[in-house]
Amino acid sequence: MSSYSRITGTGSYLPPRRVTNDDLAKELATRGIETSDQWIVERTGIHARHFAAPEVTSSDLALEAARHALEAAGRKAEDIDLIIVATSTPDMVFPSSAAILQNKLGVAGCPAFDVQAVCSGFVYALTVADAMIRTGTARCALVVGAEVFSRILDFNDRTTCVLFGDGAGAVVLEASEEPGILASDLHADGKHVGILCVPGHVSGGNVLGTPLLHMDGQAVFKLAVRVLEDAARATLAKAGKTEADIDWLIPHQANIRIMEGTAKKLKLPREKLIVTVNEHGNTSAASIPLALDEAVRSGKVKKGETVMLEGVGGGFTWGAVLLNL
């Protein structure tokens, strides 16, 4: 039995429709909501995001990202013996988007389930897949983050609707004799539920509450920078590493100020920070694998380098994974 797991392929997918800040400002103006490219960029670092067509689901985006990851790993769908999808925007209440993705891949039999930790979801899912491989439950896992967050945005709230986008990212994680996933550190604190949530739910066929995203931006910012530093340091300690061992930091792509603040806390130069939030916006559980895939395919992040992944999201949830690519 192999003692470790390692990422052997990455993939991602963005819906074709790219929405710039100017595009969004024009759309919001028809609702009487004022914003601008300058206002958005200064506060978030976001210039554009992608929105899926109304008929496109999270599993549709996941399928494209999965195909790219499988190709990069030199694997076929039939080789996969575990599928985990991290999403907060599933196709249905049930079954899981992972089960739907499994069917779209044309395979059956292996375990398939969703993980819901919002923007920390991919870090959670990767940690679960690593544990299952280490215990021999799986040998070749497909781990996906996929979201259609545009469906749950309040376009009358300029402080939130400008932040998010749709997309998917995926990795193939395989059993390995050499260390890949070095350590992880996961946390949640339910007393912060109200600062980032979608408080509505369905009961008796009716929507109760508000089925749109609510966020206290200042509270999220203050908490995020602190807990991300703590998780990163805990993960390094578990792996017997220091900040100097990190070649690249790939945080959840939420807001450039949070990302730069975290890098500064870890004494990492800006050059070691992977940034895609400028073009993708916040894609929740998809943001980390999207950024990882873009960094790998551009040649920036290379095989053998040490990468810190960090996620923080509603719940409040947060965590980190340190890996050798």
UniProtKB/Swiss-Prot annotation:
- Gene Ontology BP annotations: fatty acid biosynthetic process; secondary metabolite biosynthetic process
Task: Please classify the protein's predominant subcellular localization into one broad category.
Answer: cytoplasm
Q: Name one GO molecular function term.
A: 3-oxoacyl-[acyl-carrier-protein] synthase activity
Q: According to the UniProt record, what class of enzyme is this? A: transferase
InterPro entries in the cross-refs:
ACP_syn_III_C, ACP_syn_III_N, FabH, Thiolase-like
Instruction: Describe which pathway this protein belongs to, using the record's wording.
Output: Lipid metabolism; fatty acid biosynthesis
Q: Where is this region: ACP-binding?
A: 253-257
EC numbers, comma separated: 2.3.1.180
Q: Which reaction does it catalyse?
A: malonyl-[ACP] + acetyl-CoA + H(+) = 3-oxobutanoyl-[ACP] + CO2 + CoA
**Cysteine pairs bridged by disulfides in the record:** none
- List residues traversing the bilayer: none
For this protein, the record's Pfam families field holds:
ACP_syn_III, ACP_syn_III_C
Q: Which GO terms describe its cellular component?
A: cytoplasm
Task: Name the UniProt key words of this record, in alphabetical order.
Answer: Acyltransferase, Cytoplasm, Fatty acid biosynthesis, Fatty acid metabolism, Lipid biosynthesis, Lipid metabolism, Multifunctional enzyme, Transferase
> Domain of life here?
Bacteria
Catalytic residues, per the record, are C119, H252, N282
State its location(s).
Answer: Cytoplasm
Swiss-Prot/TrEMBL domain comment:
The last Arg residue of the ACP-binding site is essential for the weak association between ACP/AcpP and FabH.
Family designation: Belongs to the thiolase-like superfamily. FabH family.
Known partners and oligomeric status: Homodimer.
The free-text function statement in the UniProt record for this protein reads: Catalyzes the condensation reaction of fatty acid synthesis by the addition to an acyl acceptor of two carbons from malonyl-ACP. Catalyzes the first condensation reaction which initiates fatty acid synthesis and may therefore play a role in governing the total rate of fatty acid production. Possesses both acetoacetyl-ACP synthase and acetyl transacylase activities. Its substrate specificity determines the biosynthesis of branched-chain and/or straight-chain of fatty acids.
Q: What is this protein called?
A: Beta-ketoacyl-[acyl-carrier-protein] synthase III
From which organism does this entry originate? Variovorax paradoxus (strain S110)
Q: Which gene encodes it?
A: fabH
